Amino acid sequence: MSGKLTGKAREKALAGLKGWSKVKGRDAIEKTFKFKDFNEAFGFMTRVALVAEKMDHHPEWANVYNRLDVVLTTHDADGLSDKDVTLATLMDKWAGKAGKTTKK
């Protein structure tokens, strides 16, 4: 189990995430990814799902055609943890590498 991020460690971790924003009323972060089409969006989700399963850390997400809305939080920690930052960083890397555009 990852512990909840607090204080300076939290500020530092979140400062490194571009395009992610705090979810109103929750200790969570969110981002919308936009892809060329459904196949690219679903392929991205599949790659992320395989890693998320190995991490035992699963995103909350919704997909409509080329759009993917993602919310990350760690339920066991009752808020944001290193697992969320790790998964967000990986998602940004993969989305950027494949030439995807991200948009909030």
Curated annotation (Swiss-Prot):
Coiled-coil intervals, chain numbering: none
InterPro entries: PCD_sf, Pterin_deHydtase
Pfam families: Pterin_4a
Catalysed reactions listed for this entry: (4aS,6R)-4a-hydroxy-L-erythro-5,6,7,8-tetrahydrobiopterin = (6R)-L-erythro-6,7-dihydrobiopterin + H2O
GO biological process: tetrahydrobiopterin biosynthetic process
GO molecular function annotations of the record: 4-alpha-hydroxytetrahydrobiopterin dehydratase activity
Keywords: Lyase
Top-level division of the source organism's lineage: Bacteria
Gene3D superfamilies the record matches: Transcriptional coactivator/pterin dehydratase (3.30.1360.20)
SUPFAM superfamilies referenced in this protein's UniProt entry, alphabetically: PCD-like (SSF55248)
EC number: 4.2.1.96
Family note: Belongs to the pterin-4-alpha-carbinolamine dehydratase family.
Name used for this protein in its record: Putative pterin-4-alpha-carbinolamine dehydratase
Source species: Parvibaculum lavamentivorans (strain DS-1 / DSM 13023 / NCIMB 13966)
